[in-house]
From Swiss-Prot:
Belongs to the cysteine synthase/cystathionine beta-synthase family. Homotetramer. It comes from Streptomyces lavendulae. It holds the Pfam family PALP. The keyword Acetylation does not apply. The lineage of its organism: Bacteria, Bacillati, Actinomycetota, Actinomycetes, Kitasatosporales. PANTHER family: CYSTATHIONINE BETA-SYNTHASE. SUPFAM superfamilies: Tryptophan synthase beta subunit-like PLP-dependent enzymes (SSF53686). The gene is dcsD. Its cofactor is pyridoxal 5'-phosphate. GO terms for molecular function: cysteine synthase activity. It is an enzyme of class 2 (transferase). This is O-ureido-L-serine synthase.
Amino acid sequence: MPLFNSILDTIGRTPIVRLQRMAPEHTSVYVKVESFNPGGSVKDRLALSVVLDAEAKGLLKPGDTIVECTSGNVGIALAMVAAARGYRFVAVMGDTYSVERRKLIRAYGGKLVLFPGHLGSKGGNLIADELAEKYGWFRARQFDNPANPSYHRETTASEILADFAGKRLDHFVTGFGTTGTLTGVGQMLRVARPEVRVVALEPSNAAMLARGEWSPHQIQGLAPNFVPGVLDRSVIDDLVTMDEVTARDTSRRLAAEEGIFAGISAGATVATALSIAEHAPEGTVLLAMLPDTGERYLSTFLFDGVDEGSDDAWLASLDTGSGL
């Protein structure tokens, strides 16, 4: 193991793991586990790329403040990168997102400006713009910044291509969020592995790409209420929707059956991959992105109905044999 000069040097090179119990036997379903990034999500890549790009262009200097509208993961990642690079960070975030996200941002020294969640990302971006203009802060502009998909072309896509070099890969499944992963990886697959079908998913009650419709939903991190500027629609082969209950239940299954604790959007990508795999030809290979860890959803509907007390009834049942 090498010695690293900065925690930021550990971003990327996340593992790809085969599902052993959830996938149909006639297929192979793999997942790219982005929670292995130091900030716990794929958004570490975006945050680092935006900051390095801004530094190279002379848009950031030590002590400056970065501000961004975020559903949480980008905010956590930017707060981490800002701490490591000597900047301040302010997150503009809807009040419907999990409290874990707020606490993690504050743990990295960031500040929070909350707004009513029903305004969606569009409303939050307007607030972030106003703050940036008023105080002279740097706007990361994750939805429009070309550094976002560029970094995914250079790192995420390169990692996938290296890991599947000389191996079969039929489907790549990812969610509709900032679309940095979708666009960056999709563009590279188009060139290097054109046989791979790129599958984009969005919540069934917030199908901006499929129907131009949006309503508040519980798959945090997916589906802003607008179409990001960095999106390259031409990379999408299949556009599907996923209901939030199936996403939640699949996330729970990932932890209980595979030992992989991932967030609700990860449940959505895996549920989509499993649905495709169910009817796919023998030997089909699929890869689904797992954007983050489930630990930042402990206060959300991911854990609705989960008992927080002692399992005394189960323990007592062992004496009668009914708990075995």
